[in-house]
């Protein structure tokens, strides 16, 4: 099983980190663990992420490409290597929805933030938007981390 993670960085908004496994034989994804916390230092987040890296032997961490300073700090100061996530929002949401709709994602019941984010994720109702986009709320951070992981892992492993 390959183990990988998604990371959405925030400060006032929470930093969200989700750990997933992919079973190549069954072609199923497993959400194994999560971390969500706000108003913490980079060092505090790094400590939790390192703990999860050691616990799960994570192969890849896909991070929001807008978080380049955090990406550099993690690599330089905490030996946490990350890869920029694919961020095509609508394609990524469609990809995750396909996985969920086809019963290919199993979520550990202890991952309460992830369960909640999938239940509460919604589109922004603003009729003045030029295109659809997800509503920014407390559910969106873990959902973004999950999207970064699932969309980037799938596309990076099937592109060869």
Listing of model-derived features with the role each one plays in the protein:
Residues 1-9:
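ATPase catalytic-site recognition across NTP-hydrolyzing enzymes
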Residues 8-10, 35, 66, 146:
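Anionic group-transfer/hydrolysis microenvironments
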Residues 11-14, 26:
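Coil-to-beta-strand transition motifs
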Residues 15, 59, 143:
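Residue-level detector of short, conserved catalytic/binding motifs and their immediate flanks
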Residues 15-21, 147:
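Short beta-strand scaffold segments in enzyme catalytic cores
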Residues 18, 24-137, 156-160:
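Mg2+-dependent endonuclease catalytic cores in nucleic-acid-processing enzymes, primarily RNase H-like
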Residues 141-147:
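Basic, amphipathic alpha-helical segments enriched in Lys/Arg and hydrophobic/aromatic residues
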Residues 149-157:
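Short, hydrophobic alpha-helical segments
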């Amino acid at each position: 099983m390959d183990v990988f993670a998604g990371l959405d960085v925030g400060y006032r908004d929470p930093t969200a980190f989700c750990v997933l496994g992919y079973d190549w034989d069954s072609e199923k994804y497993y959400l194994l663990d999560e971390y969500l916390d706000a108003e913490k230092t980079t060092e505090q987040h790094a400590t939790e992420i390192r703990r999860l890296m050691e616990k799960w032997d994570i192969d890849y961490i896909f991070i929001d490409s807008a978080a380049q300073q955090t990406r550099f700090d993690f690599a330089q100061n905490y030996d946490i290597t990350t890869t920029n996530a694919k961020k095509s929002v609508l394609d990524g949401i469609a990809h995750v929805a396909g996985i969920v709709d086809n019963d290919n994602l199993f979520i550990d019941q202890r991952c309460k933030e992830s369960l909640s984010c999938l239940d509460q994720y919604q589109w922004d109702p603003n009729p003045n938007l030029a295109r659809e986009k997800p509503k920014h709320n407390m559910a969106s951070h873990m959902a973004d981390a999950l999207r970064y992981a699932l969309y980037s892992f799938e596309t990076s492993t099937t592109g060869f």
